[in-house]
Structure formats: C-alpha cells, structure tokens
Amino acid sequence: MTVLHSIDFFSSSSAPVAIEARAPQSAFPEHHHDFYEIVIVEEGAGVHVFNGNPYTLSRGCVCFVRDHDRHLFESTDDLFLTNVLFRAPDAFRFLSGVGHFLPRECDGVYPSHWRVNGQVLQQIKCLIACLEHAPKSDQVEDIALHESVFMQLLVKLWQGCQTQAGDDQEGRLYQLLDWLQNNYSEAVEWPELADRFALPLRTLHRQLKNKTGMTPQRYLTRLRLLQARHQLCYSDNSVTDIAYLCGFGDSNHFSTLFKREFSQSPRDLRSQL
C-alpha cells in the first residue's frame, strides 16, 4: 500500500498546514499517510472507499482522514477536490482544542463524512486561499496567523455540518442522501420518500441528479452495488445472500448489474480474493 509522507507536501518542517488541490481528482489507489487530511468536494462525483467502506461523493461532501486511516478514490467523474493537510490535532504551536471541531469516534464508529451546503463552500474559499500560501516566515506571529486561519476553516466546516440539515430544500436533500447511505437495502418508493423529506418529487429528481450526476434510481442502485462489492470482499455470505442483503430482489439480476458496473461477475471477484 502506498504511504504518503508529510515531507513531500508541507513547505517546511514548521508549516502547520498544506493545501493540495485536485482539479480533477483521478482514480487513486488505496493509501494512507503520516498526516491528517480534510477532503472537501467542490464539484463532480466519485466513490471514496474509506477503511474498506464505500461512500458516494458529491458537491459539499467533507471527509476527515486520520493518520492511520486508509482510503482510495475510484469511479471519479469531474471530481474536484481541495485537500487540507495538517500534521495532527495536537501538533499546532498556538492552537488547542482542535479536536472539538473534528469528528470523534464513539463505540468504534467514526463519522468520517460530513456534508455542508453551497453557501459554506463559498464562505471557506477565501480561507483556503489564505492557507495556500505558506507562513511568511518562521516567526511566531506568522505561524500563529496561519494557524488561526486553519481554525476559522475548521469552525466554518463544523458549523456548516451542524446546520446543513436545515429546513430548506438543499438541507432536506442532504438528509435524504444520508438516509439512502444508511438504508440502501430497504425497498424505496420515490414518491413516499419525497413526501417523507418534504420534497416535491420532480424537485427530488432534479436536485439529486444535479448533486450526484445520476437519476435517483441509478444512484440507489450504485449504492447497493458498492455495498455488495464490499460484502463480497469482506464477508463470507453467499452471492445470493449478499444480493438480498443489499436490496436486490433477484440474485440473477444483481449479477447482471454487478458485471455491468464492475466488468466482472460477483463470483469472478470472489475467486480473485
């Protein structure tokens, strides 16, 4: 597995933060690094496989990667990212309490993926632009200013995550996307789901396609296929059981869709493991 080292990304040993733009981000194999990373999705779509678990990416996704996590990007489609790198939450000279504004693992569950709305993405652009420039010098005042901008960015993201589920159409769409991520195996009737999240059905179709580049049904099918691939790799369940566990009513139809998506059958994938 590829290991990325801080010496290759930070401008100096004293630099607390580095910015790496990916415009666009192509598929990138599984890797980990000796620093922390905040991945901000500005445009496009793709799949982020984080510690073996697949997550679909779209505009407004924010992913928090620790120094012991492993991840990769695949199925990218005009995926524009800004990566904010920092050495560790406790590695700043003048900041304390950074961990308060980062995801915190609870009972073995790490909420690595957040969402923020378009307004927050616009608000943080100037902060990212400031962070792109290394501190003017190694003087303490320049390091302190640079770190303070990073804290502003972190607070903006944290506030944006807390408020993105607001009572407007964009917030309700984000709630729906999160619901699909966690309930992909359930039978979905789109008119009922639209009512549940107080979205007109046509608005749901239009906005979901704008966010993900896919129709709602295509998006759900892809979620299910990604989860099925994960189970094929990491569980002992049979192909038939996995098909039903991931929301497919027919294992033959599942195999057809799987081969179309990944260019190999479920059994062929299993045989390679």
UniProtKB/Swiss-Prot annotation:
One of its GO terms (cellular component) is cytoplasm. PROSITE patterns: HTH_ARAC_FAMILY_1 (PS00041), HTH_ARAC_FAMILY_2 (PS01124). GO terms for biological process: positive regulation of DNA-templated transcription; rhamnose metabolic process. GO terms for molecular function: DNA-binding transcription factor activity; sequence-specific DNA binding. It is found in: Cytoplasm. The record marks D241, D250 as: Interaction with sigma-70. It comes from the Bacteria. InterPro entries: AraC-bd, AraC_XylS_family_regulators, Homeodomain-like_sf, HTH-like, HTH_AraC, HTH_AraC-typ_CS, RhaR_RhaS-like_N, RmlC-like_jellyroll. Residues 191-212, 239-262 bind DNA. Residues 174-272 form the HTH araC/xylS-type domain. Keywords: Activator, Cytoplasm, DNA-binding, Repeat, Rhamnose metabolism, Transcription, Transcription regulation. Activates expression of the rhaBAD and rhaT operons. Binds DNA as a dimer. This is HTH-type transcriptional activator RhaS. The gene is rhaS.
